[in-house]
Amino acid sequence: TDEGSVDKLGNFSFFSSDSHTKYPPTLETVWYDSKWDTGSLDPLTSANLEDMVIYMKGLRPEYKENSKAKFRVVGKERFPSTTYSTTPADLTIKYLPSGSSFYSIKDAETNDVIVPFSTSSLISCDSSGNYFNLDLEGYQPERYYSLEFRIQSGSNTVDETDQYFDEGFTFKVSI
């Protein structure tokens, strides 16, 4: 839209959550806030991406309404190769592909998509591993939400593949 224009382009009506409708009104705002700094972490290689598992590190069952939370996402090889070292392979954190790892959030009861896979849901990385920050303001309290992940490998090539991970990760937003 052109903010400087005086042309009338239509009306916009928005109702409060007290309107007693079946579905609460929504207003969608998105922004790109992904950061990428791997530190000394190693990447999951393309061979690892074909057979990997995703798990959440420190996922709490409940988060307070209007809070801000950091969700840690870890990808690892399903069957790590045998190596002889002082650190077990299960404890070695590797990072997911940059710019092609996304999260999505759904209402666990209705399966309505709250946060779709998009550039505004890119997973970030720091020296401790992958993560995403979530502002829970506007989420309906006393509801459960589920997390799903999409990992793209071979982006913009003939071998591009999308893998979806819906491992049953849920959390509740409480009052």
Q: What is each model feature region?
A:
Residues V113, L122-Y144:
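Aromatic sugar-binding surface patches on proteins
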Residues N66-K68, S98, G129, Q140-E148:
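Extracellular Ig-like/FN3 beta-sandwich strand-entry sites
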Residues T1-E62, V74-S81, S101-S104, E109, ...:
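Secreted, disulfide-rich extracellular signaling modules
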Residues T110-N111, S155:
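Residue-level signal for glycine
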Residues T21, S153-I175:
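Short beta-strand elements
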Residues T1, E137-D162:
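Internal, hydrophobic beta-strand segments that form the core of beta-sheet-rich folds
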Residues E62-S67, E77-S98:
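A short beta-turn/strand-edge loop motif at beta-sheet boundaries
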